[in-house]
């Protein structure tokens, strides 16, 4: 089975979005070293839906790039469902411009970053952030992208 993708496009204009194969490739390069089989939903949303979800689940009054919703199976129930990633198209596109990053690289980074959250990684504490960013960089470079944190390190 490997990694199963459920892609939901909840945006009116789907032009310029990564393909289902792009999303699948990014998941395939990120998740299997940690969990060989998994099902992940990626939902691409507009800023209004992202804003609402970010407000409801994180208490933040603005849209955000990616939200991760890990699935926790009830005790005794074995499931490969890892969770959901909700990615906001407008935020990702604006961040790519603001950070002077190639758009597809930033999309890939959001999938990698969100997937690591689904796998239990976090960046609240400095040591956790360092570990997570290091993994993100390693995965991104393994796919031929540059270090997504390069500008912050300079």
From Swiss-Prot:
Single strand-specific metallo-endoribonuclease involved in late-stage 70S ribosome quality control and in maturation of the 3' terminus of the 16S rRNA. One of its GO terms (cellular component) is cytoplasm. The lineage of its organism: Bacteria, Pseudomonadati, Pseudomonadota, Gammaproteobacteria, Vibrionales. Belongs to the endoribonuclease YbeY family. Its cofactor is Zn(2+). It comes from Vibrio vulnificus (strain CMCP6). GO terms for biological process: rRNA processing. It is an enzyme of class 3 (hydrolase). This is Endoribonuclease YbeY.
